[in-house]
């Protein structure tokens, strides 16, 4: 392809400023290039929490997906929050236990979220202690989802309040070194949840 044709193609493209959701004050995430607005939809972009929120944890990586496009900007929705791989590796210690669970919750405003907390013990915990810690994590995560809106739950996760609550409770079972939410993923929006419920009702009525 000639330099002339490449230059012409580039001139036909447009840069769109990608913005975070309202939960993150529509902070600028970066830019994306496209010929047509339709090409921008569903693209994903990642950012550290510290890039979109003052004082945010640099070890938390956020993923957003473009869901609306304007003349020169694109809005996004939250997809996932996850600890960076390097930070996860730094938490592992020889001679201790890693206790992890996966819990799916429905918030008060009908968002379905999959949450994966993990607890690291100071020394090796036995099976009964690990089971009790796991049960505590499940109970507290389910309680957090049942009592909060999606935005409040997300803030509780990325600000470390949910991890702290789990630590305080589970540490009475066996001494813990650290508790983190390894990953939190938005599985379904309210309209998707409602559609699934309606479909389930239709099937049950047949």
From Swiss-Prot:
Which PANTHER family does the record match to this protein?
A: 40S RIBOSOMAL PROTEIN S3A (PTHR11830)
Q: What is this protein called?
A: Small ribosomal subunit protein eS1
**Family annotation (Pfam families):** Ribosomal_S3Ae
The alphabetical list of record keywords is: Ribonucleoprotein, Ribosomal protein
Q: What gene makes this protein?
A: rps3ae
The family note in this entry says:
Belongs to the eukaryotic ribosomal protein eS1 family.
The yes or no answer to whether the keyword Ribosomal protein is present is: yes
Task: Kindly list the GO CC terms recorded for this protein.
Answer: cytosol; ribonucleoprotein complex; ribosome
Q: Name a GO molecular-function annotation.
A: structural constituent of ribosome
Q: Which InterPro entries would you find in this protein's record?
A: Ribosomal_eS1 (IPR001593), Ribosomal_eS1_arc (IPR030838)
GO terms in the biological process aspect are: translation
rRNA processing in keyword set: no
Q: Which domain of life is it from?
A: Archaea
